[in-house]
Structures are given as C-alpha cells and as structure tokens.
Amino acid sequence: GVVDILKGAGKDLLAHLVGKISEKV
C-alpha cells in the first residue's frame, strides 16, 4: 500500500543521507 511505499522511500532517503554524511566525515 501507500504506507509501505512511503516507509520504503523513507528508508532509502535515510540511507542516502547517512551515506552523504559518512562521505563528509
């Protein structure tokens, strides 16, 4: 459902942000 899609997108976004932060450190 829509909620599942949003949850999946949230995880992808979180992983993307964590990756960017890790690159800067």
Swiss-Prot record:
GO biological process: defense response to bacterium; symbiont-mediated hemolysis of host erythrocyte
Modified residues (Valine amide): 25
Major location (coarse): secreted
Tissue specificity comment: Expressed by the skin dorsal glands.
Cell compartment(s), UniProt: Secreted
Annotated InterPro entries: Antimicrobial15
GO CC, one annotated term: extracellular region
Keywords, ordered alphabetically: Amidation, Amphibian defense peptide, Antibiotic, Antimicrobial, Cytolysis, Hemolysis, Secreted
Assigned protein family: Belongs to the frog skin active peptide (FSAP) family. Ocellatin subfamily.
UniProt function note: Has hemolytic activity against human erythrocytes and antibacterial activity against the Gram-negative bacterium E.coli.
Protein name: Ocellatin-1
Organism this protein belongs to: Leptodactylus ocellatus
Classification lineage: Eukaryota, Metazoa, Chordata, Craniata, Vertebrata
